A protein has these predicted regions:
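PLP-dependent amino-acid enzyme catalytic core
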Residues: 1-230
Length: 230
C-alpha cells in the first residue's frame, strides 16, 4: 500500500503497561500519553489529516462533534500548531460560561456553530454546503467528520500496529481491544494487522452506534482505505 505523508505531533511510541487480573495478563497501551493538550488517540489520525490539509493549501479546518468532543479540541489545537484556524460544528447548546473542552476550543480561537440533535444528523451536508460557499469566496476549507475517521485518518492506527509490533511479539497476543465511537481506530488496526499478516482479533467496543452499524462502519473504512491506497 502507498503510505501517505503525515505531520509529527504525537509523542510516540507510547509506553505499554502490564496488569494482571484473575489470572489473566493485560497490556495497556498508554495512548493517553501522546501529548498533554492532544491526549488520546485523536492525534494519530490528525497527523495524516492535517498534513493533507496543508498539501491542499487549506485556509481553515471544518470538523464536528459533541460540545465536549475530545476530537474537536485536539483538532483546534493541532491546527493552530500549523497556523490554521478551525470551525467546529457541534451538537449541543452554547453557554455564556464555556467549560472543559469547549473552553479550550474558545481559548484556541475556534469558530463554533451549535446544532440541535435533529439538525446534527445532517452535519456532514451542512459542512459541505458551507465549504462550497467559502470556495465561491476564494477560500479553501478542509473538512473531515467527527472522530477524524476517514480512509486517510485511519492510517494513524495502521501505523499504530507497526509501532506495537516493535514493542511486543504480536503473534503471542490474542486480542486488541479498543473503544469504538466513529470506527477509525478499529478500522486502522484491522488493516494494520492484515498488512502485517497477524492472526490477532480486533475487538471494537461500540459506544455510540449499534453493533451492526459499528461493524458496517469499520469494514467500510478498512475496505475503502485498501482501495484508496493500494
Amino acid at each position: 500500500m502507498i503510505t501517505p505523508k503525515k505531520i509529527q505531533f504525537a509523542n510516540i511510541p507510547t509506553p505499554l503497561e502490564e496488569i494482571k487480573f484473575e489470572g489473566k495478563s493485560f497490556l495497556i497501551k498508554r495512548d493517553d500519553l501522546t501529548g498533554c493538550e492532544l491526549s488520546g488517540n485523536k492525534i494519530r489520525k490528525l497527523e495524516y489529516l492535517l498534513a493533507d490539509a496543508k498539501r491542499q493549501k487549506a485556509d481553515i479546518i471544518f470538523t464536528s462533534g459533541g460540545d465536549q468532543s475530545n476530537h474537536a479540541r485536539a483538532t483546534v489545537i493541532a491546527a493552530r500548531k500549523i497556523g490554521l484556524k478551525t470551525k467546529l460544528f457541534l451538537w449541543g447548546k452554547d453557554t455564556t460560561s464555556p467549560n472543559g473542552n469547549y473552553f479550550l476550543d474558545k481559548i484556541f480561537g475556534a469558530d463554533v456553530q451549535f446544532f440541535s440533535e435533529k439538525e446534527y444528523e445532517n452535519v456532514n451536508d451542512i459542512m459541505f454546503e458551507q465549504r462550497m460557499e467559502l470556495l465561491k469566496k476564494g477560500k479553501n476549507a478542509y473538512a473531515f467528520p467527527g472522530g477524524g475517521s476517514t480512509t486517510l485518518g485511519i492510517w494513524g492506527y495502521i501505523n499504530f500496529i507497526n509501532e506495537l509490533k516493535e514493542q511486543i511479539d504480536l503473534k503471542k497476543v490474542d486480542s486488541i481491544v479498543a473503544a469504538a465511537g466513529s470506527g477509525g481506530t478499529a478500522a486502522g488496526m484491522l488493516v494494520g494487522a492484515a498488512l502485517n499478516k497477524l492472526n490477532v482479533k480486533i475487538v471494537a467496543v461500540h459506544v455510540l452506534m449499534s453493533k451492526e452499524e459499528m461493524r458496517k462502519q469499520i469494514l467500510q473504512l478498512a475496505e475503502g482505505c485498501v482501495l484508496d491506497y493500494k
